[in-house]
Amino acid sequence: FSGATEATMRVVDRVSGLIGDAPPSLMRPMGQESKPGMTEWQHPVNHFLHANILLNLNIPSEWNGSFTTGPHGARRYKAPTSINVGNTGMTVEVGAATIVNEGPHGSDTHTVDAGGCAITAMPTWPQLHPLSVPDGILAEANQRDGDGFPTWLSSQ
């Protein structure tokens, strides 16, 4: 898993250049009003700095050195258990017979299967929460640059 450490540290290196000495909403001094102002509202980086967006990394054990920012895909497991009855008793085996990945090309499931590090910008708060991030901002936050990193992270 040494590749996972390297990939994580490369993302941390990019992020640490943004944060500065003190994030703008450290300890949420104004409660639910601790969010980007109206002039900052439309920019994913401001939601990240206010801790309303987080970066989720999924990295395979054998990382190929690439990064891809994109949405989450879905992973389903078919026949996740099997029960075997034998002469000496019953055994239960846990382990999917088939793993099915769904989602668009560039989603985390497909990226990890291809050996890449998947970066997904996710909301910290659920929908309908006063600090939730609009869907359009999340969609923009998951756009990638030529190196596979979030465009908002690279444009700072």
Residues of each region from the PLM?
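Electrostatically charged, flexible surface regions
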Residues: 2-156
